[in-house]
């Protein structure tokens, strides 16, 4: 799918048609999982070659940030959710050429939806491709900050549940699963922050940005630097709560094992009495007693009650 946007009074307006003439007027061309026909339209109309899927997934810096005859290229990670609502990251390829911004991605992303909504109302300052690129990065950082706030709120809730110490092992297992998911979210946010920092560093080194965009890029870098310590504290808190949950689960399991161990020891004397009188020897005087059976029962009960009272007194039960 191709979305093309032109400028009208310093605001982005969507172009209804994707003909070569219309695309020539566009300042931003946004492509979501384009077909071969759509790639051909760009190649024939604007002489623009798009990155392939394998190129999008390349992690080498030289393959993610470079400049060639097709323009300036940046490949950046964006946070999103997969089809099962689990944290995921998607790669977006940015290309700036002839004053036009091209964005290529395989799925729709929240940061892009939010920016399109804002762009309908807010005017651009310099109305150039670099401003669009930095606005998208700015929106991404705002989204990541919102994700970190959500993680913080969830951690506060889980910390009360865990440190209360009254939850059963089954409930703590669910909390542990949720904490693992939060750790995954946190790690993906960290990856996006670091990747954006690398992209901006490349942009500042390799291009002569206009003054307003230069200051905007530096502001975004400062925002990233301010989020990183906050992210680190959340990451440490996730690990602390996971260890605390594991500790309480181990305590609960040890309590159960302790109970069964004490019970098994408590019945050992009674089992000994039963074993003695269960032997099949011919000469066992007690077997001839009239009260041998009730006497053996009393001995077994006494042998069971005595350890129980002792363990109870010691606080082991």
Curated annotation (Swiss-Prot):
The keyword Magnesium applies. The record marks 254 as: Essential for ion permeation. Pfam families: CorA. It comes from the Bacteria. The keyword tRNA processing does not apply. It catalyses: Mg(2+)(in) = Mg(2+)(out). A motif (Probable selectivity filter) lies at residues 278-280. Keywords: Cell inner membrane, Cell membrane, Ion transport, Magnesium, Membrane, Transmembrane, Transmembrane helix, Transport. One of its GO terms (cellular component) is plasma membrane. The chain crosses the membrane at residues 259-279, 291-311. It is found in: Cell inner membrane. GO terms for molecular function: cobalt ion transmembrane transporter activity; magnesium ion transmembrane transporter activity; nickel cation transmembrane transporter activity. Its main location: membrane. Gene3D superfamilies: Magnesium transport protein CorA, transmembrane region (1.20.58.340). It is a multi-pass membrane protein. Mediates influx of magnesium ions. Alternates between open and closed states. Activated by low cytoplasmic Mg(2+) levels. Inactive when cytoplasmic Mg(2+) levels are high. Homopentamer. In the absence of Mg(2+), interactions between subunits are weakened, and dimers, trimers and tetramers can be observed in vitro. The central ion permeation pathway is formed by the first transmembrane domain from each of the five subunits. Mg(2+) binding strengthens interactions between subunits and leads to the formation of a symmetrical homopentamer surrounding a closed ion permeation pathway. Low Mg(2+) concentrations trigger both a conformation change within each subunit and a loosening of the interactions between subunits. This results in an open ion conduction pathway. In addition, this results in a less symmetrical shape of the whole complex. Belongs to the CorA metal ion transporter (MIT) (TC 1.A.35) family. This is Magnesium transport protein CorA. The gene is corA.
């Amino acid at each position: 799918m191709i979305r093309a946007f032109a400028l009208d009074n310093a605001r982005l307006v969507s172009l209804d048609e994707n003909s070569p003439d219309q695309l020539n007027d566009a300042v931003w061309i946004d492509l979501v999982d384009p077909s071969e026909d759509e790639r051909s339209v760009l190649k024939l109309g604007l002489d623009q070659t798009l990155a392939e899927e394998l190129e999008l997934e390349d992690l080498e810096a030289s393959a993610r940030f470079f400049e060639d005859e097709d323009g300036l290229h940046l490949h950046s990670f964006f946070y999103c959710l997969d089809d099962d609502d689990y944290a995921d990251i998607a790669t977006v390829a940015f290309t700036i050429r002839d004053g036009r911004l091209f964005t290529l991605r395989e799925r729709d992303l929240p940061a892009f939806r939010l920016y399109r909504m804002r762009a309908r109302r807010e005017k651009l300052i310099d109305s150039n491709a670099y401003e669009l690129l930095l606005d998208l990065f700015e929106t991404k950082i705002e989204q990541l900050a919102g994700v970190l706030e959500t993680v913080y709120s969830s951690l506060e809730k889980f910390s009360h549940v865990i440190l209360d110490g009254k939850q059963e092992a089954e409930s703590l297992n669910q909390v542990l699963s949720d904490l693992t998911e939060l750790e995954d979210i946190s790690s993906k946010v960290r990856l996006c922050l670091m990747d954006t920092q690398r992209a901006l560093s490349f942009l500042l080194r390799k291009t002569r940005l206009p003054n307003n965009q230069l200051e905007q890029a530096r502001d975004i870098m400062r925002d990233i630097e301010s989020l990183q310590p906050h992210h680190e504290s959340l990451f440490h808190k996730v690990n602390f709560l996971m260890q605390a949950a594991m500790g309480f689960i181990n305590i609960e399991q040890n309590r159960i094992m302790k109970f069964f161990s004490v019970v098994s020891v408590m019945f050992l004397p009674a089992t000994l009495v039963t074993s003695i009188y269960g032997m099949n020897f011919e000469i066992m005087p007690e077997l001839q007693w009239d009260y041998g059976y009730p006497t053996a029962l009393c001995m077994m009960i006494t042998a069971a009650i005595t350890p129980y009272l002792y363990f109870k007194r010691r606080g082991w039960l």
